[in-house]
Amino acid sequence: MLHNRMTTAFERSKEQEHEAAKNEIPSFQVFIERRDFLGAITVLKFLKSTRNTAEVGNADLWIAYCNFHLGRHEEALEIYTALKKSKNPPLDAHTLDLYRAICMLYLGQMGDARELATTLPPTPLSNRLLFHACSRLLDEESLVTYHTKLRNVSADQMALAAVHFLRTHYQQALECYEEVLQVQPECFAIYMHMALCYYKLGDYLKSEEFLMLYRENAEDSLTSLNLYAATKFRQGKMAEALKILEELQNDETIVGLPIFKHNKCLYTEMNAAVHILPPLVGIVSEARQNLVKLYIEKGQYEDAYKVVQSFEPAVSAEYTLKAAAYAYYGQTVQDMAVLQYAQAAYSTVGQSDADRDTVLGRRAMAAAYFLTGEFEEASMYLESIADIPKESEDSFMLNYSLCLAATCKVTEALERLMSVMGSTNFTPVHRTWLGRLLIRAQRSAEAFDLYRDAEKNSLQTILLMKVIANECFAAGEYQYAERAAAILVDLDKASKDHYIMIQKACIAAMELIRRGKTITPPELVYETE
């Protein structure tokens, strides 16, 4: 009985200790180890308010650290500046200035960060900071100087990888990450960086593979969930992407983030995008790109042009974005200066050492040749990437088809163009080219069928029928030429050329009949009221 009572008392004591431990507030170090920086700030501010900071040291220094890791770089900068001005700074002035310079770098104040860092004694950390700042300021000479001072240690290799990434040298960045992993395999956060590199390279399956490795250690990471949804979206799995995003909707802090608003808009087929995307330009990196794409899809080329007109591109994707907006707008208003800029921007990307052998670089070079009417060269570049899976496969196929058509490769051009007839990017221009190719492939009846689906009494339809009339006449299909000219008489009453075409087609057809050839008139496809 005594033993039982002692056991019961002991168990009750352990339960009370366990309950007390549950109710005990964790130390700020525990919060930091969990990367719960908000929790750490709360504890630190409480300790500071109760003047119980003996075990903490300088609470403000830790609060600045937590703010920095929360992305609150301005708050961190203010604290470091205040600490430097205080009577008894917790660190020497050089260290505090270095921390201030790092905050400036993250705030985009590259010039200020560089100016401050160059006044400090050289250290590996200051060298990495200056290496980054010079990269962003495009100071190549200084960049090389700081590059030579990088050591073969993990921190410097990570800095080098970051600069490679910013310059879209994703393969080189991956090589740096692999080197670091060989030395420090426990750095699972590198898997996230590698996943992002593969995403940028368009290898979405490989990106998912590294994301899974990362999420084994950080399942609740917003960044990884966002990237995972993006890989699904790029693979055309819209529903899966939206489902992943919806899992985060219960968190009010996440729902309010610009990146969440942007991606939800993107995954819901750009519903209300015209209202959601403009305020996000300059905040979310892809917002400008998607807004320009939206305007181009809607045929609002002037709006697309205005979005990028004052924007200075820094990386290849930004150059091609601005080039596309300029190309569409320049062709619409027939402005050669705008078109020349588009051609030059495409050439810059296509001829660069970093991009010349990538899908982006080859498409850019093809576009540059396309704008100058050098379709043979454009076709050669497009052919080299024809079998590689691409994000905008329809747009690629339409452009490739036109290049093939312009170089008289009728059969191949026709096959590829017909495969994307249902695309939202299939325009009246493509329909007209399809009609031309069908006639050249001796399928005039099918070319005539295009008129059935065309918008009646529009300028595009008149152009289509003119092409059909002229191509049929050139191909000796005089009955179709006559019928097309007859329809043009109804559509374009102001022109007398169509009557002449009817006369010529009828005379030519009668001559063929006289020679014994049987001519079958085309079916009536449209009667004006």
Swiss-Prot record:
Primary location class: other
UniProtKB keywords: Cell projection, Cilium, Cilium biogenesis/degradation, Cytoplasm, Cytoskeleton, Flagellum, Repeat, TPR repeat
TPR repeats: 57-90, 154-187, 189-221, 285-321, 359-392, 428-461
Composition bias, Basic and acidic residues: 11-21
One MF annotation (Gene Ontology) recorded for this entry: intraciliary transport particle B binding
Subcellular location: Cell projection, Cilium, Flagellum; Cytoplasm, Cytoskeleton, Flagellum axoneme; Cytoplasm, Cytoskeleton, Flagellum basal body
Highest taxon listed in the record's lineage: Eukaryota
Biological process according to GO: intraciliary anterograde transport; intraciliary transport involved in cilium assembly
Disulfide bonds: none
Cellular component terms (Gene Ontology): 9+2 motile cilium; axoneme; ciliary basal body; ciliary base; ciliary pocket collar; ciliary tip; intraciliary transport particle B
Positions of the UniProt region annotated as Disordered: 1-21
InterPro entries assigned to the protein according to its UniProt record, in alphabetical order: TPR-like_helical_dom_sf, TPR_rpt, TTC26
Pfam family, one: ANAPC3
PANTHER family assigned: INTRAFLAGELLAR TRANSPORT PROTEIN 56 (PTHR14781:SF0)
Family as reported in the entry's similarity comment: Belongs to the IFT56 family.
Record's function text: Component of the intraflagellar transport complex B (IFT-B) involved in flagellar assembly.
Protein name: Intraflagellar transport protein 56
Organism listed in the record: Giardia intestinalis (strain ATCC 50803 / WB clone C6) (Giardia lamblia)
Lineage of the organism: Eukaryota, Metamonada, Diplomonadida, Hexamitidae, Giardiinae
